UniProtKB/Swiss-Prot annotation:
Residues 16-72 are annotated as: PAI subdomain. One of its GO terms (molecular function) is RNA polymerase II cis-regulatory region sequence-specific DNA binding. Residues 92-140 are annotated as: RED subdomain. Keywords: Developmental protein, DNA-binding, Homeobox, Nucleus, Paired box, Transcription, Transcription regulation. The keyword Transcription regulation applies. Gene3D superfamilies: Homeodomain-like (1.10.10.60), Winged helix-like DNA-binding domain superfamily/Winged helix DNA-binding domain (1.10.10.10). GO terms for cellular component: nucleus. Its main location: nucleus. Residues 13-140, 187-246 bind DNA. It is found in: Nucleus. Pfam families: Homeodomain (PF00046), PAX (PF00292). This is Paired box protein 3 homolog.
Amino acid sequence: MTTDSITFNHILGQGRVNQLGGVFINGRPLPIHVRHAIISMAKKGIKPCHISRQLKVSHGAVSKILNRYAETGSISPGQIGGSPRARLTVQAVEKEILIACDENPQMSAAELRDWLIHKDICTKGNAPTVPAIKRLIGNKGVGVPKKMERKRLSYSIDSILGISIDECSKSSSDDEEGSSPSNDASSRRNRTSFTAEQLDVLENAFRADTYPHANARESISKETGLSEEKIMTWFSNRRARCRKNMPMYQQYNVQGFGSSPPSYPTLLPSPMMFLPSYSTSPQLNPLFFQHILQSSPPSSQSSPPSSS
């Protein structure tokens, strides 16, 4: 059984057949007459998929040629990317366009294209198109103020809390300057170090109420010397740590140890207990279980009492 192989008498000997039946050379650009045919068909309004089928050229090659023509106005290959000299040429043209925009921001894209041709920076054949110049100006942000004024929305957090954006940025910058010992400390997170006395006061307040009200926060602030923002942050982190450890306590309460009732509370915590409106005593507070369990951990050796 013999198979017929397709060979091409090409000087490079690299002829291949694509899925559409067209001949191409791997690593080589399409011939110039095929490129002209693609551009002329596109100008007539023919879709790229139909161009690909009629000329037997892959859809990716057709799209690449059309995109290059739309950006640079050139049909010849290697204008975008490829050799370093071509990249430097494109960068030089972009630099001239940006300089002209800075000197005369009122110039339109069509006037910039005519200016490039008049200054002999480009020719009519390789000058960038008007849409390409508009895209370059839009991407570089020429003529647009660099710092836009931030508008506070009526439903934003700043409006709800009554906090000014400028005050927040100023206070955060002041905290960074005051707490950073070195220049690169501003890139790190500012963490507050609490003393043992402050932690005792905070823990006692947390056992009494996991969501302290304004008066309680004010009294804690007077005792510890901390700001209310830091106190609220500490309580938030403390509640998160308790919620993270809560499944372990639930499993411990569900399994049980022995038939005799334990000496510590076994009430399963409910998510409703974490709400500020849920009033509970320190003994029934589920977040208080952590201190009870840490002080009297269950023994793994415990076994049910033998009936005698």
